């Protein structure tokens, strides 16, 4: 306060000195005025004195219409004034050809009236937070709104007639500025009426928030239209109004916020009426039954939010007009009620097992897959797995006296039913008889959660997948820059973490692809083949010996025939039974004999000369 008084006294003394010096030089009134207006230093001193007088006038009018200004009102006034001064300086650059003392005075008056519009808006908003409003407050606000409305209308009318008579000039800017101030006065007046009606009623007015929301929506739409028309006219008749960019952006943002609030509030109120249950008397007794919005006890008509906080229905309706969060925990009620609106997705188990497109061959149980080697994977974990239903249980192993028969597949090597398999050591094991019961069929490998292999799905080409990244050995292999790139909450840190997850996903896909290839190769191998000798004559002789059925074990091995001589046939040897011969001579389904059948025919040709 003391600094302000010193500055005003210094400005007054400097102005008196300049006027006295000019009068001392000219000795007459009119030449003194001409000298002051033509001298730049004298005009600068006079401008400073004019600003001081405007400041004093503002102080006086503030005391009359507002009394003591609150700290929040002063803060808002200073914050908006700095932006207004900056926009005024930009307007001076746009209208530099019209720069004159009258032009500066008009902009100063516009800034002066804007300050009172802002103070009136803050003071009317204070009515909602103040329980006691005196009659002096009503008289001040009503008289100020009446005065501001009259001044705005007069300046708009003056600018309109000036544009009609003199054409487009700087009055175009003042006309639109005062028109926007008129919409502000209209908004202040509607809010004042709504607050006054609410103060007169004993109970809180539930529909006040609705009217205020639609009032802001209506006046915001008018402001956006005015700014768009002003920008269009200024660009067409003068130049681009750079000083109007910020207020136009603020008006558009405020209008967008009003539209969003209207939509979200209606959605929140609809959810409150349809989704949120009414609070029971037991729930009200279990918690503090005081509504934190209105500070009154809740007896009936209370709603329970998804966060289990309870409020009055009318209080929640008024609260949701402004924000869609819980008044206590600030939980987003729209996001919390989103899963309740959408039905849950059906479980994959309800769909049942998918139908098998083609009969798939069964794999023999490999000995190198112990039980529980691989744990079952959760469904949908890897994109390469096809959807599958429940898997059949693994059949029990065959008894010690029975041998599992290999499945007759096209990929596995088939053997005759009555033939015995000869091992590398020379011992032979007899196969089951044709009339015997076959052993249990082999199922999927134990420990695998899928029936291998994918016979109906072709393998993708190896170049269809992205190159596999090299997995790091640990954090010790990362540089400090790479570690810092993974830490933090900024965008580059999130992108680094997402890239790491993509690398992990690629490695898992590559591992599943290799498992798929391994199982496909394993399915095509079939049962293990016996070890064969290098000499073809010995192989032929061993096959002949194994092909002859015997009821008792031989005491000694059959002699190996020399090359070129046919082997002797024992007297007790008999031709095979017709049933077994018929079974042996059966061909596969495709009509072509396999390797075992061809070998049997060659043996028959070798035996035919000896038999005769």
From Swiss-Prot:
GO terms for cellular component: endoplasmic reticulum; endoplasmic reticulum quality control compartment; Hrd1p ubiquitin ligase ERAD-L complex; ubiquitin ligase complex. Residues 341-375, 393-409, 435-449, 560-570 have a biased composition (Pro residues). Residues 1-251 are annotated as: Involved in FAM8A1 interaction. The chain crosses the membrane at residues 5-25, 42-62, 99-119, 141-161, 170-190, 225-245. Residues 416-434, 539-559 have a biased composition (Low complexity). InterPro entries: HRD1_E3_ubiq-ligases (IPR050731), Znf_RING (IPR001841), Znf_RING/FYVE/PHD (IPR013083). It catalyses: S-ubiquitinyl-[E2 ubiquitin-conjugating enzyme]-L-cysteine + [acceptor protein]-L-lysine = [E2 ubiquitin-conjugating enzyme]-L-cysteine + N(6)-ubiquitinyl-[acceptor protein]-L-lysine. Pfam families: zf-RING_2. It is a multi-pass membrane protein. Residues 236-270 are annotated as: Interaction with p53/TP53. Residues 1-4, 63-98, 162-169, 246-612 are cytoplasmic. The keyword Phosphoprotein applies. Residues 474-529 are annotated as: HAF-H domain. It is found in: Endoplasmic reticulum membrane. Keywords: Developmental protein, Endoplasmic reticulum, Membrane, Metal-binding, Phosphoprotein, Transferase, Transmembrane, Transmembrane helix, Ubl conjugation, Ubl conjugation pathway, Zinc, Zinc-finger. GO terms for molecular function: ubiquitin protein ligase activity; zinc ion binding. Residues 586-595 have a biased composition (Acidic residues). GO terms for biological process: ERAD pathway; immature B cell differentiation; in utero embryonic development; intrinsic apoptotic signaling pathway in response to endoplasmic reticulum stress; negative regulation of endoplasmic reticulum stress-induced intrinsic apoptotic signaling pathway; protein catabolic process; protein stabilization; protein ubiquitination. Residues 21-42 are annotated as: Interaction with SEL1L. It comes from the Eukaryota. Disulfide bonds: none annotated. Auto-ubiquitinated. Deubiquitinated by USP19. The RING-type zinc finger is required for E3 ligase activity. Mice overexpressing Syvn1 develop severe spontaneous arthropathy. Mice lacking Syvn1 die in utero around 13.5 dpc due to augmented apoptotic cell death. Homodimer. Interacts with p53/TP53. Interacts with HTT. Component of the HRD1 complex, which comprises at least SYNV1/HRD1, DERL1/2, FAM8A1, HERPUD1/HERP, OS9, SEL1L and UBE2J1. FAM8A1 is stabilized by interaction with SYNV1, which prevents its proteasomal degradation. OS9 and UBE2J1 recruitment to the complex may be mediated by SEL1L. SYNV1 assembles with SEL1L and FAM8A1 through its transmembrane domains, but interaction with its cytoplasmic domain is required to confer stability to FAM8A1 and enhance recruitment of HERPUD1. This is E3 ubiquitin-protein ligase synoviolin. It comes from Mus musculus. The gene is Syvn1.
């Amino acid at each position: 306060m003391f600094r302000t008084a010193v500055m005003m006294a210094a400005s007054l003394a400097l102005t008196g000195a300049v006027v006295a010096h000019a009068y001392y030089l000219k000795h007459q009134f009119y030449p003194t005025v001409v000298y002051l207006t033509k001298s730049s230093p004298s005009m600068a001193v006079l401008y400073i004195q004019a600003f001081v007088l405007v400041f004093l006038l503002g102080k006086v009018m503030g005391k009359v219409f507002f009394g003591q200004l609150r700290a929040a009102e002063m803060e808002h006034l200073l914050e908006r004034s700095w932006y207004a001064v900056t926009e005024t300086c930009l307007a001076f650059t746009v209208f530099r050809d019209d720069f004159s003392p009258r032009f500066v005075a008009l902009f100063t008056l516009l800034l002066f009236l804007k300050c009172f519009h802002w103070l009136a808006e803050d003071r009317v908003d204070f009515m909602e937070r103040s329980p006691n409003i005196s009659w002096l407050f009503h008289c001040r606000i009503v008289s100020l709104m009446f005065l501001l409305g009259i001044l705005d209308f007069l300046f708009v009318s003056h600018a309109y007639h000036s544009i009609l008579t003199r054409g487009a000039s700087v009055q175009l800017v003042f006309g639109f500025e005062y028109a926007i101030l008129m919409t502000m006065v209209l908004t202040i007046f509607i809010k004042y009426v709504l607050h006054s009606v609410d103060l007169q009623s004993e109970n809180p007015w539930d529909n006040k928030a609705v009217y205020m929301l639609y009032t802001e929506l209506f006046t915001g739409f008018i402001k956006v239209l005015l700014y768009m028309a002003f920008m269009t006219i200024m660009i067409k008749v003068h130049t681009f109004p750079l000083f109007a960019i910020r207020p136009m952006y603020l008006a558009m943002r405020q209008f967008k916020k009003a539209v969003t609030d209207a939509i979200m509030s209606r959605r929140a109120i609809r959810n409150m009426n349809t989704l949120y249950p009414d609070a029971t008397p037991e729930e009200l007794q279990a918690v503090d039954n005081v509504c934190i919005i209105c500070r009154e006890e809740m007896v009936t008509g209370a709603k329970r939010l998804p966060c289990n906080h309870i409020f009055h229905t009318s209080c929640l309706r008024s609260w949701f007009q402004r924000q869609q969060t819980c008044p206590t925990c600030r939980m987003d009620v729209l996001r919390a009620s989103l899963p309740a609106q959408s039905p849950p997705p059906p479980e994959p188990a309800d769909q049942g097992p998918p139908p098998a497109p083609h009969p798939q061959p069964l794999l023999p149980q490999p000995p190198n897959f112990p039980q529980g080697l691989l744990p079952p994977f959760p469904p949908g974990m890897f994109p390469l797995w096809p959807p599958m239903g429940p898997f059949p249980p693994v059949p029990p192993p065959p008894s010690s006296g029975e041998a599992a028969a290999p499945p007759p597949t096209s990929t596995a090597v088939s053997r005759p039913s009555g033939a015995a398999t000869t091992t590398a050591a020379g011992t032979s094991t007899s196969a089951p008889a044709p009339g015997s019961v076959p052993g249990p069929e082999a199922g999927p490998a134990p420990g695998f959660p899928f029936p291998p292999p994918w016979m109906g799905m072709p393998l993708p080409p190896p170049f269809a997948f992205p190159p596999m990244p090299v997995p790091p050995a640990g954090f010790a292999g990362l540089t400090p820059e790479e570690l810092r790139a993974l830490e933090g909450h900024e965008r580059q840190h999130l992108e680094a973490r997402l890239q790491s997850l993509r690398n992990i996903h690629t490695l898992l896909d590559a591992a599943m692809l290799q498992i798929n290839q391994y199982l496909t190769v394993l399915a095509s191998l079939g049962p293990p083949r016996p070890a064969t000798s290098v000499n073809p004559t010995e192989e032929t002789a061993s096959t002949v010996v194994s092909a002859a059925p015997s009821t008792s074990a031989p005491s000694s091995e059959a002699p190996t025939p020399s090359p070129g001589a046919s082997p002797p046939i024992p007297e007790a040897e008999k031709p095979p039974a017709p049933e077994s011969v018929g079974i042996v001579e059966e061909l596969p389904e495709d009509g072509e004999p396999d390797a075992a059948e061809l070998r049997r025919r060659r043996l028959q040709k070798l035996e035919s000369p000896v038999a005769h």
